[in-house]
Amino acid sequence: MFLGTHTPRLDDKGRLILPAKFRDELAGGVVITKGQERCLYVFPTPEFQHIADQLRAQPMTHKAARAYSRVFFASAHDEVPDKQGRVTIPGHLREYAALDRDLVVIGAHTRVEIWDRVAWESYLAESEDEFADIEEGVLPGL
């Protein structure tokens, strides 16, 4: 399970050093793809395969599933982190998420998310008030 917030920097070659506490779970390989709210999702390869299986189970006649699959898979980049725990974020994904040098990497249970630091701070500011309101709908009785 991925938890926590980390603030690494992107190097000049577009590489990110994965947080140390995530490296063991990601050492076997990752898939980086477009996420919601203009962040990037980083999945361990087995988790990405699980999602791929779920999408494959959708009928080809399901228009929304086809559309989502196209974007999700077309933008995906698979890689094995190097010995220093680095992964390269391809240019098209850096552009999609508007990544600058300063990043925020968060644990989001089954995946890791990569955000531009300014975008993350803006997202938090906008969603903070909603957090308490949506809690009851997501986790009733918590």
From Swiss-Prot:
The organism named in the record is Salinispora tropica (strain ATCC BAA-916 / DSM 44818 / JCM 13857 / NBRC 105044 / CNB-440)
- Which GO molecular function entries does the Swiss-Prot or TrEMBL record give? DNA-binding transcription factor activity; transcription cis-regulatory region binding
Q: In the UniProt record, does the keyword Chloroplast occur?
A: no
Output this protein's name: Transcriptional regulator MraZ
What Pfam families does the database record attribute to this sequence?
MraZ
Tell me where it resides: Cytoplasm, Nucleoid
Primary localisation category: cytoplasm
Q: Which residues form the SpoVT-AbrB domain?
A: 5-47, 76-119
Per UniProt, subunit arrangement is:
Forms oligomers.
UniProt record similarity statement: Belongs to the MraZ family.
Query: What keywords is this UniProt entry annotated with?
Result: Cytoplasm, DNA-binding, Repeat, Transcription, Transcription regulation
Query: Gene behind this chain?
Result: mraZ
Q: GO:BP terms for this protein?
A: negative regulation of DNA-templated transcription initiation
Please verify whether the record's keywords include Transferase.
no
Q: Which GO terms describe its cellular component?
A: cytoplasm; nucleoid
Write down the InterPro entries for this protein, in alphabetical order.
MraZ, MraZ_C, MraZ_dom, MraZ_N, MraZ_sf, SpoVT-AbrB_dom, SpoVT-AbrB_sf
